[in-house]
Amino acid sequence: MMGIAIDILWAAIIIVQFIIGNIANGFIALVNIIDWVKRRKISLMDKIITALAISRIYLLWSTFLITLTSSLDPDIKMAVKIIRISNNTWIIANHFSIWFATCLSIFYFLKIANFSNYIFLYLRWRFKKVVSVTLLISLIFLLLNILLMNMHIDIWSDKSKRNLSFSVRSNNCTQFPRLVLLINTMFTSIPFTVSLLAFLLLIFSLWRHLKTMQYYAKGSEDTTTAAHIKALHMVVAFLLFYTVFFLSLAIQYWTSGSQENNNLFYATIVITFPSVHSCILILRNSQLRQASLLVLWWLLCKSKDVRMLVP
C-alpha cells in the first residue's frame, strides 16, 4: 500500500514537472525565435539557449513516453527492439540537452572571466569557433555512446537467445540495466567535468578581480564583479541539478535489482532537471524575464475581463 502511494506521488510530480518543463522551454524557444524574426539577427548566447530549450523539450517527451510505456507494460521494456529504440532516443535527447548547457557554461566563462594567459585570450577572441568545435567533438562522443550501447544490447540479446533459462528476473537480465547506467554515466560525466572546470576558473577569476579591486575601490561592486556573480549563479544552478542527476544515476545503479521501484524516482529526477533549470534561465535572463512578466500581466488582465463578463 505504501509502495503504491509513493508511486502515485512520483507520477504526480512527473506530470507536473513535465507540464512546467514544456511550458518553460517552449516559452524560451518561442520568445527567442520571435525576436530573431523581428531583428533578423540573434546573439550566440540566444542561439545556445534556444537550442537548449528545444533539446530539453525532446528530452522531456522521450523520458515521459519511455516511463509511461514501461509503467503500463513492465515486460515490454525488456524487448530487444524496445530497448534499442528507447535507449538510442534517450541518449540523443540527453546528449544535446547536457552539451548545449555545457556550451552555455563555456560561453559565460570565455565572455566574463579575465585572464592574461595567451591560450585564454586566443579562445576568447574565437569563442564562436570554440562553441562550434565543442559541439562537433560532442558528436563523436554521441556516436561512440550509441555504438557502445548497441553493441552491449546485441551481446545481451545473443546471450538471451542462447540461454533457454534466461528470463526477465534472471541475474543476467538484472545486470543489463546496471551496465546501461554505467555507459550513460561515463559519457555524461565528460560535459559535467567541462562545466565544473569552467565554474572553478570563474571563481578563480572573480577572486583575482576582487583582490585587485581592494586597492582601488574597497567594498564596492563594479560591473565586472556583478557579471562574474551572475555567470556563477547560472553555472551553479546547472551543476547543482547535474549533481542531483548523477546521484540518481548512482542510486539507480546500486538498486537496479529492484528496478521497478526506482523507475519513477529516476524519471522524476531526469524530468525535474530540464524543467526547473529552464525556469531559472528565464528568471536570470532579462529579456526572457521581461517577456514572462508581460505574459503574466496579459493573462491577469484576461482573467479580470472574464470575471467582469460573468454575471
From Swiss-Prot:
Pfam families: TAS2R (PF05296). Gene3D superfamilies: Rhodopsin 7-helix transmembrane proteins. It is found in: Membrane. Residues 33-47, 111-129, 208-230, 284-311 are cytoplasmic. One of its GO terms (molecular function) is G protein-coupled receptor activity. InterPro entries: GPCR_Rhodpsn_7TM, TAS2R. Glycans are attached at residues 87, 163, 172. It is a multi-pass membrane protein. Keywords: G-protein coupled receptor, Glycoprotein, Membrane, Receptor, Sensory transduction, Taste, Transducer, Transmembrane, Transmembrane helix. Residues 1-9, 69-89, 151-186, 252-262 are extracellular. The chain crosses the membrane at residues 10-32, 48-68, 90-110, 130-150, 187-207, 231-251, 263-283. One of its GO terms (cellular component) is membrane. Belongs to the G-protein coupled receptor T2R family. PANTHER family: TASTE RECEPTOR TYPE 2 (PTHR11394), TASTE RECEPTOR TYPE 2-RELATED (PTHR11394:SF128). Putative taste receptor which may play a role in the perception of bitterness. Several bitter taste receptors are expressed in a single taste receptor cell. This is Taste receptor type 2 member 125.
